[in-house]
Amino acid sequence: MTEVYVDVAAASMEQGGAGAAVRPAEPEAVRALRYLADSGIRVVIVAAGIRPDAELEAVAAEVVDAVPARPRGPAWYITSDIARCRGASARLRTVLIGAAPPSGSVRRCDAVARDVQAAAMEILAAVAMPPTTDAGPT
């Protein structure tokens, strides 16, 4: 089963700074994550010290403090922090939400999306149409 890890900050509205006890979720992000869950993808919220609001937590199968060092199977990580793309497991595809990193950046994410909704569409497409390893008919 494919898992999608999502930072609370990536799925939240701009309000609710670092000192907020609960960061309010972006409604379109919640809708996109619910669509992933309804499609059979396991959605996991990565709290990292920021408590998700009830709506965001309700769409998740689990809330964890950090992404596991080695995911159990194919997995994606949606984050708004480019530093979290570095050092990720080869089994974990990272998607940066927001602006693309500056050219020449030493930190590399596997993909960049304007928002969680665009990231969800990319994930759904990749799950539905995985790359073929076959060179073709023989």
What are these regions (language model features)?
Residues 1-8, 14-41, 53-76, 80-138:
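Asp-based, Mg2+/Mn2+-dependent phosphohydrolase catalytic module
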Residues 47-49:
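Conserved phosphate-coupling serine/threonine residues in phosphotransfer and NTP-handling enzymes
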